Amino acid sequence: MLQSTARTASKLVQPVAGVLAVRSKHTLPDLPFDYADLEPVISHEIMQLHHQKHHATYVNNLNQIEEKLHEAVSKGNLKEAIALQPALKFNGGGHINHSIFWTNLAKDGGEPSKELMDTIKRDFGSLDNLQKRLSDITIAVQGSGWGWLGYCKKDKILKIATCANQDPLEGMVPLFGIDVWEHAYYLQYKNVRPDYVHAIWKIANWKNISERFANARQ
């Protein structure tokens, strides 16, 4: 019975081992701007700490977890592989979310493309209404998490959603994310999360958001 279970576990994890064996290390992406470029909305100090400390920690932890997962999989240790999943989701999600977040911001992000603006008006009535609705649900996130504007390929519409902790957005293509972990704003905005959320629209990189929207529709 034990031998049969071990053989089954080995079969389950073997395909994963092949994937992990060829996967390269994750690296901290460079920012598309200098740390001070988003002032006064986000301070140099916050941006540097957020990028060099917090995002870097997610990347380092993710690489370590994948090494442990590779070892567990190679040994057919299904129990250990399963036990690593929460940490993989947390740190992997942190890396995914922040990699999107940095590109979503710019000192002069312009305006939504015509195609995106037309879709915003269709699905939300106006850009102001989209901003209000996404801001409201993001401010209301309990504890730490993210607010997202996403594109649902199935329904072919824009939707808004929130995700707890570092959970990545599911069921939609992420277009624009607002990080409401306290490390993203507390040094500057203290406990007044609404001020931070409302201010971040001033540095929304609509060029990047529009490009993500165009790619999502393909």
Swiss-Prot record:
Residue range of the transit peptide in the UniProt record, numbered on this chain: 1-24
Gene Ontology CC terms: mitochondrion; respiratory chain complex
Keywords from the UniProt entry: Manganese, Metal-binding, Mitochondrion, Oxidoreductase, Transit peptide
Tissue specificity comment: Expressed in pharynx and rectum. Upon thermal stress, expressed in vulva, body wall muscles and hypodermis.
Note accompanying the cofactor annotation: Binds 1 Mn(2+) ion per subunit.
The protein's Enzyme Commission number: 1.15.1.1
Binding site for Mn(2+): H50, H98, D179, H183
Induction summary: By heat.
Name of this protein: Superoxide dismutase [Mn] 2, mitochondrial
Source organism phylogeny: Eukaryota, Metazoa, Ecdysozoa, Nematoda, Chromadorea
